[in-house]
């Protein structure tokens, strides 16, 4: 039988006191899912209607709640997960939930209905609660627990007005459940939004969870690691992102907002295998002694304190480095530069006419102009030129309709964004249709992008367009300009001259689309000062005198 529910004594309640538990539908989903996991469920089904404000339901096949404990379920600080300990000292938490506030908060903010039955119990109990009013009755139900929270904040109009749109809340809920799938991959998961299945996962290992959340192509590019205290997967070096949003960590089964030290430990393990400024995909489950971490420092319990963070970070770094060392890691060769296409010269930019002097380290151009020495980052400059060229060409031709629409795998998060911004994407030639079951159909592509020498072009375009950036058009152009741009080791004098010519025609030649500078300028006076010389020649004015 399940552990009975009891009300915590005041000294324990003070230890676990937290801020507001339920401030949005996402909080309800998280708290109910944690309860299902703590109950040992092997199947968890979540239904969300109206962005969660109309209804959130979580159904599990876990241990259930004994009939005699059901009336206490919506009481504040009533829980089966902690017992009264010493009146001083810290708590040792071994479950995801422990405060006994989730059901109480849900009943205060909306209408709560709970139906539950332990497997060994004859008949189920049903509880309805709204505010402090509680009603319990007998019913029939399968083993497990179903919790429904409806009309959230209906009695709190001020709070209701501050809620995000239904689409935005659904996007965050799907992202949250994706993290639970990644760290609890051995369970059956199902998310339904307004009657439409959004996420379905059958029991699998970490690689299978990556396939569910990020698609089979990503799953095929991850390496498995299993060391004492650290288990999971990390991506091969070719699967990287500019952001760290696909670096996932859990401590004792709890998905957490990782401290920077853990993210840095993973990145450091790649050493020179990882391009600067990029991050890998990783899903890492960390195991520590319960007394060595504290989840009670934030209402959402997603920020935890680790007693020996440096030691944990070192263990993570060694585990990731070991996984990478055990596999051959080969990179694909990038595309080459093409001469700039002729077009009317822009009126803005004011980039000087530079004379190429030489190439340094097959990446930097040394040039002179206006009496000064210029150092040009060829990759950033080429990236800027490609970005502006793609931007000019994007609206000049009708979208290219694919002969056969391509099916692509979408994450639940991407599916939610597709529903938000599908019309905006069609406005500049990108037509993506939701095909159901985590798939999307790519029907048209902007003609300017169709012939770019970018591996997995369609996948890259769709992934970037449905990322979290505020301007999907700009994000797509910036990424497609970066991928084929010149890399270190590809530069020679001929390509350097083409880069300078292309940069001179840019409207904004001074930075790449990601904000990095394209050029550095050194005057002769700067050089003379650095070398301790007392004067310089006024070459810029055509005089050879020392000033």
From Swiss-Prot:
CDD domains in UniProt: HATPase_MutL-MLH-PMS-like, MutL_Trans
GO cellular component, one term: mismatch repair complex
A family per Pfam: MutL_C
GO function terms (MF aspect): ATP binding; ATP hydrolysis activity; ATP-dependent DNA damage sensor activity; mismatched DNA binding
Domain of life: Bacteria
UniProt cross-references to SMART domains, sorted A to Z: DNA_mis_repair (SM01340), MutL_C (SM00853)
Signal peptide positions on this chain: none
UniProt keyword annotations, A-Z: DNA damage, DNA repair
Keyword DNA repair annotated: yes
GO biological process: mismatch repair
Chain's role: This protein is involved in the repair of mismatches in DNA. It is required for dam-dependent methyl-directed DNA mismatch repair. May act as a 'molecular matchmaker', a protein that promotes the formation of a stable complex between two or more DNA-binding proteins in an ATP-dependent manner without itself being part of a final effector complex.
Protein family membership: Belongs to the DNA mismatch repair MutL/HexB family.
Protein name: DNA mismatch repair protein MutL
Organism in which the protein naturally occurs: Deinococcus radiodurans (strain ATCC 13939 / DSM 20539 / JCM 16871 / CCUG 27074 / LMG 4051 / NBRC 15346 / NCIMB 9279 / VKM B-1422 / R1)
């Amino acid at each position: 039988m399940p552990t009975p529910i009891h009300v915590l004594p005041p000294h324990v309640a003070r230890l676990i006191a937290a801020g507001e538990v339920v401030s949005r539908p996402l909080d309800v989903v998280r708290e109910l899912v944690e309860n299902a996991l703590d109950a040992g469920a092997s199947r968890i089904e979540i239904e969300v209607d109206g962005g969660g404000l109309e209804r959130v339901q979580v159904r599990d096949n876990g241990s259930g709640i004994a009939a005699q404990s059901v009336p206490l379920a919506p009481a504040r600080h009533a829980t089966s997960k902690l017992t009264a300990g010493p009146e001083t000292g810290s708590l040792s938490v071994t479950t995801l939930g422990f405060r006994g506030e989730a059901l109480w908060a849900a009943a205060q903010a909306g209408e709560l209905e709970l139906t539950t039955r332990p497997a060994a119990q004859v008949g189920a109990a049903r509880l309805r609660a709204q505010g402090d009013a509680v009603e319990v009755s007998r019913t029939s139900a399968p083993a497990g627990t179903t919790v429904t929270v409806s009309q959230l904040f209906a009695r709190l109009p001020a709070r209701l007005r501050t809620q995000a749109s239904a689409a935005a809340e659904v996007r965050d809920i799907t992202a949250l459940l994706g993290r639970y799938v990644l760290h609890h991959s051995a369970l059956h998961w199902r998310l339904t939004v307004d009657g439409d299945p959004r996420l379905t996962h059958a029991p699998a290992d970490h690689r299978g969870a990556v396939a569910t959340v990020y698609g089979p192509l990503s799953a095929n590019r991850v390496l498995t690691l299993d060391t004492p205290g650290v288990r999971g997967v990390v991506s091969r070096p070719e699967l990287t992102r500019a952001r760290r949003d696909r670096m996932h960590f859990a401590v004792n089964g709890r998905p957490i907002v990782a401290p920077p030290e853990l993210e840095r430990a993973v990145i450091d393990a790649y050493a020179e295998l990882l391009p600067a400024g990029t991050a890998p995909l990783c899903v890492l489950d960390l195991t520590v002694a319960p007394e060595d971490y504290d989840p009670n420092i934030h209402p959402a319990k997603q920020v935890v304190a680790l007693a020996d963070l440096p030691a944990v970070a070192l263990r993570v770094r060694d585990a990731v480095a070991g996984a990478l060392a055990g596999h051959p890691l080969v990179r694909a060769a990038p595309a080459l530069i093409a001469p700039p296409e002729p077009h009317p010269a822009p009126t803005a930019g004011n980039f000087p006419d530079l004379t190429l002097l030489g190439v340094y380290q097959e990446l930097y151009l040394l040039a002179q102009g206006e009496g000064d020495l210029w150092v040009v980052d060829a990759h950033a400059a080429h990236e800027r030129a490609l970005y502006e060229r793609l931007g000019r060409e994007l609206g000049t031709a009708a979208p290219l309709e694919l002969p056969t629409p391509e099916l692509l795998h979408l994450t639940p998060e991407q599916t939610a964004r597709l529903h938000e911004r599908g019309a905006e994407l069609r406005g500049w030639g990108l037509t993506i249709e939701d095909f159901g079951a985590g798939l999307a159909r790519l029907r048209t592509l902007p003609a300017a992008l169709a012939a770019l020498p970018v591996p997995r072009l369609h996948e890259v375009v769709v992934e970037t367009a449905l990322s979290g950036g505020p301007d999907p058009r700009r994000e797509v152009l910036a990424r497609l300009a970066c991928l084929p741009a010149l890399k270190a080791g590809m530069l020679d004098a001929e390509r350097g001259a083409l880069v300078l010519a292309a940069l001179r025609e840019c409207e904004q030649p001074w930075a790449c689309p990601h904000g990095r500078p394209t050029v550095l300028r050194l005057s002769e006076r700067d050089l003379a000062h650095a070398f301790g010389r007392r004067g310089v020649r006024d070459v810029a004015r055509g005089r050879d005198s020392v000033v």
